């Protein structure tokens, strides 16, 4: 008898330890794991900032810390809910310069993360340039606000694309690109997914700058090597390499604090037509290389990369507007034919049939807008993990563990980032105070077929009624009335379930 008790006790101890280890490895350590620091304008933790964050201070775009901020958030002074296990709160400020900044919200970690994904927030002041560079990670960018010109090398050719709000563009790892904010007097806000699977192992991603800003990757080569490679004199090389050290985001025209010299890249963007072409020839005086040198065998020849970016040859100059580069795709253009819509809201899902580069990225994109008090019905994604960013309004995210217990019931507001593991049931509910809009990325570029657990198109209506009634322990008529009571599908009217709840109405008016 005593042996049996000890055996049972030992077994219970093993189960308990295993449960704790699984919880930790799955990334459910709770708020301590996610608590980044620093703040900044676009998300983060302590200090808040315009795009909100975790710690004290909040900020205009919501946050988790004390004070809440203009757009609310969790923690003291801003709503909250249960522990935000599926909120992405750990962030790093990777760029800070006179012309803008970039903050990266780090991917969650654990065994249930099938494909890690960081979320980046880039802010650029008017008339600024994100200097030419390439990354060790792929980017899928979404223009949240503003207009820009993207210069990128793809399929061994240089092309420029005009981007506006709603545009999506994929930049593969290793592709040289730059971004120029062309919006008149308007900040450029970009949200991007960052795929670290090809990275060198850095915490966020590693940029390699071609020219200007921080030290160019070219600056590490011996000067005599570069003068030979570029076929220029040493003074000309020094002019290229030492023109500016103002960070990776610089003003095209002189910024708030005038500098002795503007960059070659700034001068380049400020010129037009033939004047630009002549000035570039004067600066670099690059000669035609051998036929072998002109081939972009893998896109990594420094001479050809720079020539391609600057568009020095007549042939490239003529073809830059119609290169092999893919066009962007504007997700707002699909609002006329959304994936689903009713009077309670609409949703748009993009896969590789809509935008071919998504097939190479392995990432899908979605955009959801819920009217005040509406709910995206409880459902699960059988093919992908979902990452979401709140664009407008506020609401609740509810996630359920496989064992049927609540995993998260958290208030979210603008700038918050959340993730939903594959197969986990969840729903989103808009606040009664206004519409709730969020954009996001999925870990599959195939057509997403969410399985709804509630509504007129739910799985319960598809299953055998007799089996269902036995499973729930009720008679068939009761079961039928239960599953047929909701006549709407996908997006449901749920004012009673929507925040703010009783007792929160007064305080939430000021969130």
Curated annotation (Swiss-Prot):
SUPFAM superfamilies to which the protein is assigned, alphabetical: RmlC-like cupins
Glycosylated sites: 231, 369, 403, 464
Keywords attached to this entry: Glycoprotein, Signal
InterPro entries per UniProt: Cupin_1, RmlC-like_jellyroll, RmlC_Cupin_sf, Seed_Storage-Functional
The keyword Glycoprotein is annotated on this UniProt entry: yes
Source superkingdom: Eukaryota
Any one of the GO CC terms: plasmodesma
Transferase in keyword set: no
Residues annotated as domain Cupin type-1: 86-238, 329-480
Pfam family, one: Cupin_1
SMART domains: Cupin_1 (SM00835)
Signal peptide: 1-27
Spans annotated as Disordered: 54-81
Function description: Seed storage protein.
Family listed: Belongs to the 7S seed storage protein family.
Protein name, per record: Vicilin-like seed storage protein At2g28490
Native source species: Arabidopsis thaliana
């Amino acid at each position: 008898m005593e042996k049996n008790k000890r055996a049972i006790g030992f077994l219970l101890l093993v189960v308990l330890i295993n449960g704790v280890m699984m919880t930790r490895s799955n990334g459910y350590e709770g708020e301590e794991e996610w608590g980044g620091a620093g703040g900044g304008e676009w998300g983060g933790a302590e200090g808040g900032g315009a795009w909100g964050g975790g710690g004290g201070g909040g900020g205009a775009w919501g946050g988790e810390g004390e004070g809440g901020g203009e757009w609310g958030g969790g923690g003291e002074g801003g709503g909250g809910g249960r522990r935000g296990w599926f909120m992405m709160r750990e962030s790093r400020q990777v760029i800070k310069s006179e012309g803008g900044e970039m903050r990266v919200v780090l991917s969650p970690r654990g065994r249930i993360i099938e494909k890690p994904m960081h979320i980046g927030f880039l802010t650029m002041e008017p008339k600024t340039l994100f200097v030419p560079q390439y990354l060790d990670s792929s980017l899928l960018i979404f223009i949240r606000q503003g207009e820009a010109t993207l210069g990128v090398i793809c399929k061994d050719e240089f092309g420029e694309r005009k981007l506006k709000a709603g545009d999506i563009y994929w930049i593969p790892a290793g592709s040289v690109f730059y971004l120029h904010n062309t919006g008149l007097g308007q900040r450029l806000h970009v949200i991007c997914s960052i795929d670290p699977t090809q990275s060198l192992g850095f915490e966020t991603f590693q940029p390699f700058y071609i020219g200007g800003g921080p030290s160019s990757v070219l600056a590490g080569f011996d000067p005599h090597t570069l003068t030979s490679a570029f076929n220029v004199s040493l003074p000309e090389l020094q002019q290229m390499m030492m023109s500016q050290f103002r960070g990776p985001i610089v003003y095209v025209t002189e910024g708030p604090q005038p500098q002795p010299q503007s960059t070659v890249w700034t001068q380049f963007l400020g010129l037009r037509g033939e004047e630009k072409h002549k000035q570039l020839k004067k600066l670099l005086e690059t000669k035609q290389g051998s036929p072998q040198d002109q081939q972009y065998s893998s896109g990594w020849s420094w001479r050809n990369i720079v020539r391609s970016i600057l568009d020095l040859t007549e042939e490239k100059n003529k073809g830059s507007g119609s290169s092999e580069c893919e066009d962007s795709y504007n997700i707002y253009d699909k609002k006329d034919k959304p994936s689903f819509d009713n009077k309670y809201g609409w949703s748009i899902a993009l896969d590789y049939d809509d935008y071919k580069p998504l097939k190479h990225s392995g990432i899908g994109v979605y955009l959801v807008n819920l009217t005040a008090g509406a709910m995206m019905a409880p459902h699960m994604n059988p093919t992908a993990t979902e990452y979401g960013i709140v664009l407008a309004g506020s609401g609740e995210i509810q996630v359920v563990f496989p064992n049927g217990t609540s995993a998260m019931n958290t208030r979210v507001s603008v700038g918050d980032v959340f993730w939903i593991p594959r197969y986990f049931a969840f729903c989103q509910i808009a606040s009664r105070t206004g519409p709730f809009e969020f954009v996001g990325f999925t870990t599959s570029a195939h057509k997403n077929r969410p399985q709804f657990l509630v509504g007129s198109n739910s799985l319960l209506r598809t299953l055998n009624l007799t089996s269902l009634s036995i499973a729930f322990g009720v008679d068939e008529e009761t079961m039928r009335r239960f599953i047929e009571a909701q006549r709407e599908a996908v997006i449901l009217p749920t004012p009673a379930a929507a925040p703010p709840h009783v007792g929160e109405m007064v305080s939430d008016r000021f969130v």
